[in-house]
Amino acid sequence: MNDWMPIAKEYDPLKAGSIDGTDEDPHDRAVWRAMLARYVPNKGVIGDPLLTLFVARLNLQTKEDKLKEVFSRYGDIRRLRLVRDLVTGFSKGYAFIEYKEERAVIKAYRDADGLVIDQHEIFVDYELERTLKGWIPRRLGGGLGGKKESGQLRFGGRDRPFRKPINLPVVKNDLYREGKRERRERSRSRERHWDSRTRDRDHDRGREKRWQEREPTRVWPDNDWERERDFRDDRIKGREKKERGK
């Protein structure tokens, strides 16, 4: 955790495919392809890579003159190359701009990213092909950034920096504390339920006691008890006579 950086200092296809750079296994075939790829930067590319910017998400109608007009505000431009399709000659939507001075590169990197040119919000980053060790281009499953719709997001660059990894010990402690809190709440709930049941029983006992106090146990006098017994016996004898007479 102490050496965590949002921007990759060295390109690792496996880490680039992970939102926090901690994946241990590739999650798609493109990552596998990038891990197996061996890429050598184009030696035919000229210019100082440390003074060169990568400009992407350009309107396909944007021309070199427009780019020069915008980016010359930050300093003197030595070279500007708008990448075009070799067959059709149409723009591919990205360019490389080399400045004469480092301060111009830094200023353009800081201020030009997110500018709107010909109704398109552009993306500006340093050139990575010749400056980032281990670089693998997107066509081989690597690259950085990307759109969600493409399903091939790559992290560790300016467009999509790594997110800080979750501190697992902290998470475990939080879960432990949460579990203890839930157990305490359940215990309190049981205690409240038990107290409620106890109060109900006490209430019932009290009500029964009050009823008993209001209605004392009936005590039969001896003569009343004898009359009740004689009355019951007479009813039984009368029923027997009636049944014999049928």
Swiss-Prot record:
Principal location class: nucleus
Gene Ontology CC terms: nucleolus; nucleoplasm; nucleus; U12-type spliceosomal complex
Basic and acidic residues bias: start-end ranges: 192-217
GO MF terms held by the record: mRNA binding; snRNA binding
Protein encoded by which gene: SNRNP35
PANTHER family reported for this sequence: U1 SMALL NUCLEAR RIBONUCLEOPROTEIN 70 KD, U11_U12 SMALL NUCLEAR RIBONUCLEOPROTEIN 35 KDA PROTEIN
Protein name as annotated: U11/U12 small nuclear ribonucleoprotein 35 kDa protein
Covalent link (Glycyl lysine isopeptide (Lys-Gly) (interchain with G-Cter in SUMO2)) residue numbers: K172
Claim: Protease is one of the keywords in the record: no
